[in-house]
Amino acid sequence: MAPKVFYISDGTAITAEVFGHAVLSQFPLEFESLTIPFVETLTKAEQVKRQINDCFITTGERPLVFHSIVKAEIRDIIYSSEGLDYDFLNTFVAPLEQHLGVSASPVLHRTHGKANHGYEARIDAINFAMDNDDGQTMKHMDQADLVLLGVSRCGKTPSSLYLSMQFGIKAANYPFTEDDMDNLKLPDALKRNKKKLFGLTIDPVRLHEIRQSRMENSRYSSLKQCRLEVKEVEMLFKRERIPYIDTTNHSVEEIATKILDVTGLERHMF
């Protein structure tokens, strides 16, 4: 039976999920998880406590409880459950108070709330990524922080969206298609913004597998075409001295982190 995990917060539960996932990913196990956000009242906290206790009674195993709860009275109710408790905020707040010599002044939803000064910047970045996805337009390249280049289905769109959502980076992306291969070159709008360009490549066999699931047995998905496109685009990257990375078997989080590391782009944390 898969171990049971609860992610609980009086906010969005994003922090609890990220922390919990990071810890549990160290173990070669499958976990069955439940996320419960916005536990903002004592009544809701008691309901969650009963869920945790019922899980313990049913399975005979204490469920893992990762939480980031600001309100002490709600946190105390979760503490009193039969779950194995991992309190992200309290673990770090007390030592930081001692080190900084300042008492914490918890404000609910401060990290992810709309009142945060970076909210508008993040929304602008997300809109920019969607408006400038897959070479839809070249009019806004001058406004981009980053322009991702690569063959179709190499990870450009998810990487652009992740960078915009997580770090407020205005990331456009531009695809090189089958029609470009005979005379592969940078469009003028990209040449003008060459310092913003970053390439993504991928193993041709993996690209073939991805494209097969989209357009099976087509020229677009053939291994021969995939090899040709990857070879030509990598040659362009080298010729134009555009930095690039291989996305094969890497998660979007890993790809984004590598891009930031190579480019030195500033992360805007929200």
UniProtKB/Swiss-Prot annotation:
Q: Which residues of this UniProt protein bind ADP?
A: 150-157
List the molecular function annotations (GO) for this entry.
ADP binding; ATP binding; phosphotransferase activity, phosphate group as acceptor; protein serine/threonine kinase activity
- List the Pfam families hit by this protein, alphabetically: Kinase-PPPase (PF03618)
Q: Which domain of life is it from?
A: Bacteria
Q: Which UniProt keywords apply?
A: Kinase, Nucleotide-binding, Serine/threonine-protein kinase, Transferase
Enzyme Commission code: 2.7.11.33, 2.7.4.28
HAMAP family, per database record:
PSRP
Q: What is this protein called?
A: Putative phosphoenolpyruvate synthase regulatory protein
Question: Which species is listed as the source?
Answer: Shewanella baltica (strain OS155 / ATCC BAA-1091)
